[in-house]
Curated annotation (Swiss-Prot):
Record gene name: rpmH
Gene3D superfamilies noted in UniProt: 1.10.287.3980
Domain of life where this protein originates: Bacteria
InterPro entries recorded: Ribosomal_bL34 (IPR000271), Ribosomal_bL34_CS (IPR020939)
Protein name: Large ribosomal subunit protein bL34
Transmembrane helix keyword on record: no
Entry similarity comment: Belongs to the bacterial ribosomal protein bL34 family.
High-level lineage: Bacteria, Pseudomonadati, Spirochaetota, Spirochaetia, Spirochaetales
Gene Ontology BP, a term: translation
Organism, as annotated: Borrelia duttonii (strain Ly)
NCBIfam families: rpmH_bact
Gene Ontology terms for molecular function: structural constituent of ribosome
């Protein structure tokens, strides 16, 4: 059986990246909540690795 998590950096950034969050009102609310909580990484885009 194929496992459910098949990692892809492109798909991950398109769905959960900073620009994806900024596109929608609810996404901006997520960012606002995470800022208020004091998260060091707001989105997966902040996990800066060599792509």
């Amino acid at each position: 059986m194929k496992r459910t998590y098949q990692p892809s950096r492109v798909k991950r950034n398109r769905k959960f990246g900073f620009r994806a969050r900024m596109k929608t009102k609810s996404g901006r609310l997520i960012l606002a909540r995470r800022r208020a909580k004091g998260r060091s990484k707001l989105t997966v885009s902040d996990e800066k690795k060599k792509y």
